[in-house]
């Protein structure tokens, strides 16, 4: 199964109210590292970003995201623009066949010259959010998302229809079991 599919499938499953997937995965011997299930309430700062929009099926998720990030990074390098933060995926919609996303990299200010047509400049989502930290493989994000879903349901929080993953470790060079991903759940 592709590396991101399991994590993002859980978001879809949680949206349907099927929160028992964590127990099923535990029985399937998926190795995970526990997170702090409380989440940390923060105010997410809106930042200028350069991003590539895309859509992907679940079986091509990881490759689609990597290609999008490579495109953004190549533009920033060519334009001499330094990133001001970690790469992030902003999931704008999710369903059983795939998802729509923005593969974004924060910058200090919008570029003076517009990027090529396959890229855009915008602002990352800002405002009240819950921050969770996932440590481990993409496959183990399923349990992390299950814990997040339980927390949001238990606290009866009204989450927005967007999800953000911020990659604090390099997706290409970090051993998969050493990945660190900040997961932001914007709330109303």
Residue ranges with predicted function:
Residues 2-6, 17-188:
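A solvent-exposed interaction/effector surface
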Residues 7-13:
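Sec-dependent N-terminal signal peptides
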């Amino acid at each position: 199964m592709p590396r991101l599919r399991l994590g993002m499938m859980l978001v879809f499953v949680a949206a349907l109210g099927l929160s028992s997937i964590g127990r099923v995965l535990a029985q399937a011997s998926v190795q995970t590292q526990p997170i702090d299930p409380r989440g940390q309430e923060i105010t997410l700062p809106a930042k200028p970003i350069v991003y590539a929009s895309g859509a992907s099926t679940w079986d091509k998720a990881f490759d689609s995201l990597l290609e999008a990030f490579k495109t953004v990074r190549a533009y920033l390098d060519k334009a001499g623009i330094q990133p001001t933060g970690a790469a992030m995926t902003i999931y704008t919609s999710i369903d059983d066949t795939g998802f729509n996303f923005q593969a974004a990299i924060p910058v200090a200010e919008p570029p003076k010259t517009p990027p090529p047509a396959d890229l855009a400049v915008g602002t990352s989502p800002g405002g009240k959010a819950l921050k969770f930290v996932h440590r481990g493989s993409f496959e183990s994000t399923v349990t992390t998302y299950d814990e997040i879903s339980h927390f949001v349901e238990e606290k009866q929080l009204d989450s927005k229809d967007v999800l953000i993953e911020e990659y604090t470790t390099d997706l290409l060079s970090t051993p998969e079991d050493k990945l660190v991903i900040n997961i932001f759940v914007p709330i109303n």
